[in-house]
Amino acid sequence: MDARKRGRPEAAASHNSNGGFKRSKQEMESISTGLGSKSKPCTKFFSTSGCPFGDNCHFLHYVPGGYNAAAQMTNLRPPVSQVSRNMQGSGGPGGRFSGRGDPGSGPVSIFGASTSKISVDASLAGAIIGKGGIHSKQICRETGAKLSIKDHERDPNLKIIELEGTFEQINVASGMVRELIGRLGSVKKPQGIGGPEGKPHPGSNYKTKICDRYSKGNCTYGDRCHFAHGESELRRSGIA
């Protein structure tokens, strides 16, 4: 009896809790039908547990096309990417994340969240928020991003709109904010920045500083920017 045990290495890897031998369904199929013999993919080998039989296994450990091909032949689950595993443990009740979000459960913390900042004229901050927060709430509700307005670190005439969320959420929210700024700027231009042609009043600080974003090539305001886009637009404070 001991000799038979030593002659079958696969038996040693398949002890059950009662001290006997336990064969997998796949192994029993190969013995009973004789169809194993490297004719089917090994489901254990292509699983997270791995195959304990190694070279003695009766099933294929290599299938052209890899896991996807083996999955189609044996009805295995599709592979779970590492990003999906990270997201499963990062948000929502019970540490699960569905990828769609539950509209009734509020915002979900999402793997890979980041922030983006937009500089705006301080006079536009209140209008961007809107009466009772109507504009900021709409942006947050439609995009899922968080929006907050903070003081500018260096210029008291500016405010910082900070957006927090995923790259896609921030991208959509930024577009909505800039569209809102464009509408507000066109309404305020006759009163806030000058005459009918949009020229600044002598006492304003319009175009008195070089635009940092323009120097870096990422200013999104274009002609609406309050800062100079080059030396040709730069003017001294108090001079029209």
From Swiss-Prot:
The ranges of region (Disordered) come to: 1-37, 81-106
* Keyword vocabulary terms for this entry: DNA-binding, Metal-binding, Repeat, RNA-binding, Zinc, Zinc-finger
Q: Which GO terms describe its cellular component?
A: nucleus
Q: Which GO terms describe its molecular function?
A: DNA binding; DNA-binding transcription factor activity; mRNA binding; RNA binding; zinc ion binding
ZnF endpoints (C3H1-type): 36-64, 205-232
Pfam families per record: KH_1 (PF00013), zf-CCCH (PF00642)
SUPFAM superfamilies (UniProt xref) = CCCH zinc finger (SSF90229), Eukaryotic type KH-domain (KH-domain type I) (SSF54791)
Biased-composition ranges, Gly residues, are: 89-104
Q: Is the keyword S-adenosyl-L-methionine assigned to this protein?
A: no
**InterPro entries for this protein:** KH_dom, KH_dom_type_1, KH_dom_type_1_sf, ZFP36-like, Znf_CCCH, Znf_CCCH_sf
List, alphabetically, the CDD domains matched: KH-I_AtC3H36_like (cd22464)
User: Domain KH: where?
Assistant: 113-177
- Output one GO BP term: regulation of DNA-templated transcription
Name the coiled-coil region(s): none
Q: Origin, by domain of life?
A: Eukaryota
Please tell me whether the keyword Methyltransferase is annotated for this protein.
no
Identify this protein by name. Answer: Zinc finger CCCH domain-containing protein 52
Question: What is the protein's species of origin?
Answer: Arabidopsis thaliana (Mouse-ear cress)
Instruction: Give the taxonomic lineage as stored in the record.
Output: Eukaryota, Viridiplantae, Streptophyta, Embryophyta, Tracheophyta
